[in-house]
Every structure is written in C-alpha cells, then in structure tokens.
Regions:
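N-terminal secretory signal peptides
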Residues: 1-15
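N-terminal export leaders
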Residues: 15-25
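Conserved alpha/beta-hydrolase
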Residues: 87-105
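Active-site nucleophile loop of the alpha/beta-hydrolase fold
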Residues: 158-169
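Gly/Ala-rich beta-loop-alpha elbow adjacent to hydrolase catalytic centers
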Residues: 131-139
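Serine-hydrolase catalytic core
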Residues: 204-286
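Short, surface-exposed "cap/lid" segments of acyl-processing enzymes
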Residues: 42-90
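Catalytic active-site module of serine/aspartate enzymes centered on a nucleophile-bearing elbow/loop
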Residues: 287-333
Length: 333
C-alpha cells in the first residue's frame, strides 16, 4: 500500500475523531443553552418579587422594604441594576426588592398576590414604593388597592419621570398603534419588534455608537428581555390608566415626583402638573429635577450619582431619619 495513502487515511481518521468530538461538544452546548433558555422563559411566565441582597439593610430594617415597580420594557436584570444604583440612598431606610412582571402580560392582580406573599414571608410591616417611569402608575394603583382590600398603608411612593396620563407620553403614534393591535388580539412578532427597536435607537442615537445600537436592539430580543406580549400589555395599561380613580384613595401615603425638563419620552411639565392636580393632598414634593442624568428619562441605572444626590435631598422630606439620642455618657441611639 502506498505510504502516502496510509498517511492520508490516518489524517482523515484523526480529523473525523476531532470533528465528531467537536460536534458532540457543540451539540451539548446548544442543548444546554436551549434548556437554560426554556427554563428562563418558563420562570418568567409568572409575576414575582425579587430581592436585592443587602445584609446590612436586612439587619437594620427587618420589617421595612422598598419595592421597585420597573418601567416600560425593563427586564428583571435591569430592575436589579436600578436598585443597586440607588442602594446608597434607599438602603438607609429599608430592604430592597423589585417586582418582576410576567412575560404573559402585565396583571395587577398577580402583582398584588406576589406582593402579599412577599410581605407575609418576610414579615414586613412598612412598605415604600419606587415607581420607575410608567411603574409609578402601577405603584399608585397597587398602593390604593392594598389600602382598600387589605388595610395596608404604603408609606411612601417616589414617582421617577412617571406619566400621570397617556397624554403625557410624547410618542403618541407608536403608542396608539401598539395598543390598538393588542386590543384586537394581534401580537407583534419578534422580527417586527426588532425592526422597531432598531429604528427607535437610530432616531434617538445621541452619543451611542452603531455597535451599541445593535447590541441594545439584540438585548431587547434575548430570552432575558420582556416579551412582546408584556410590552404591548404595558402600553395598554398606560393608555387606559385614569388618575381620577386613585386621587382620593391613597390614604396617608407621602408621594413625590422627580423628573427632567429635557425628557424626550414623557412630557415633564405635563406629567408634573397632572400629579400635582390629582394627588395634591399626598404630594409632598414635585420640584426636584434629575438634571444631568443621561438619558434624561428615568435612568438611575445610568446616572446613579445624579439620582442619589436628588434622593439625598428628597428622602429627608419623605422619611426623616430618627435623630440619635444620648450623649458621650451613653444612651439609646
């Protein structure tokens, strides 16, 4: 037998073995990735309350917690990042947790049920709400319903760039089309949503690179991102929300609105005026601004320094810390 043929056969055998092992490895990784993807999607079919671990806050405030209500198209991961960015301010008054909306759609009853379970399991007695963008609407309704249905009084609600009406949202054309499709039962497929996400980021490119635009578009289409159904249901919720239902239903909750005059998503003057008009008896502050935050709409995850400075001025009005008592000789603190 020709030695060259033998060498070629040996090389082919070695290559085939490597190719086989490589194929098995790739298949295993793909199967594992598909399993993880399905598991993530399965878990996100229910509404949950997610904690952000902070042992110091848990020790200091065992029965008090902030609850974040995330904004439009905000994923569970980004909600946790928001809380981590605000930890310096919020953790001085309570533990930290966020609502994770179900990918099957926004459901206030489910949010209430998840919150009741969380309160019972953690033995919480004091609740503070932080409404991120449209999450301020959700926080307001949840607080009103907790009071009327359970007799639970939410102590504080911070409204971060939150619209108080569909008319406060600047992009009315997209808003109306999404809601109309949702109401007639049409769900937006991923390819259409991907085109919109990309176009939206091109229009609002600002200082982002093209690579960042593509990355952010793909993030919105990953298994970790909110589903198209959830986003459509969030849009419908904003569209249907009526502040007059809750203006007299907040009990003794102390509310505050913060925002940015440069906001290109929600009209700052319109939203501020509406919160003042309908929640005047509860609204403690509405003049603090997140100037310098980028992007200007509800961006604590990107502008933590700005937000913590604003909250450093706001929270003493809403939740004054108890003054230490006692002197050098001892005493309670």
């Amino acid at each position: 037998v020709d030695p060259a043929i033998l060498r070629a056969a040996q090389r082919l055998k070695a290559f085939s073995r490597r190719a086989f092992l490589g194929g098995v490895t790739a298949s295993s990784l793909l199967a594992a990735d598909m399993f993880v993807t399905r598991e993530v999607q399965r878990q996100r079919r229910q509404t949950v309350v997610l904690e952000v671990a902070d042992d110091a806050a848990r020790r200091r405030f065992p029965d008090a917690s902030w609850i974040l209500f995330p904004g439009y198209k905000t994923s569970w991961e980004e909600a946790r990042i928001i809380l981590s960015s605000l930890r310096g301010s919020l953790a001085d008054r309570g533990q930290l947790a966020t609502v994770g909306y179900s990918n099957l759609g926004l459901d206030i009853d489910e949010i209430l049920d998840a919150l009741r379970v969380h309160v019972r399991q953690k033995r919480l007695r004091t609740l503070y709400f932080y409404g991120h963008s449209f999450g301020g609407m959700v926080a307001t309704e949840v607080a009103a319903r907790l009071l009327s249905q359970d007799g639970v009084q939410v102590k504080v609600i911070v409204l971060d760039s939150s619209p108080a009406s569909k008319f406060d949202v600047l992009d009315q054309a997209w808003f109306d089309s999404v809601v109309h499709l949702y109401e007639i039962g049409v769900r937006i497929p991923s390819i259409v949503r991907g085109g919109y996400e990309f176009g939206e980021r091109v229009i609002n490119k600002h200082e982002r690179t093209w690579g960042e635009i593509v990355d952010q578009t793909l993030e919105q289409l990953s298994p970790l991102a909110p589903s198209s159904v959830l986003i459509q249901s969030e849009s419908e919720y904003i569209y249907q929300w009526d502040a007059t239902r809750f203006g007299d239903a907040m009990g003794t909750a102390r509310m505050a609105f913060i925002g940015n005059p440069s906001d290109t998503t929600v009209s700052y003057p319109s939203a501020r005026a509406r919160w003042e008009r309908y929640f005047g008896r509860n609204l403690v502050s509405s003049d603090l601004q997140t100037i310098g935050a980028f992007p200007p709409h509800a961006s604590p995850q990107w502008s933590g320094i700005v937000y913590n400075q604003v909250l450093g001025r706001l929270l003493p009005q809403l939740l004054p810390l108890p003054r230490p008592t006692g002197g050098a000789g001892g005493g309670a603190a």
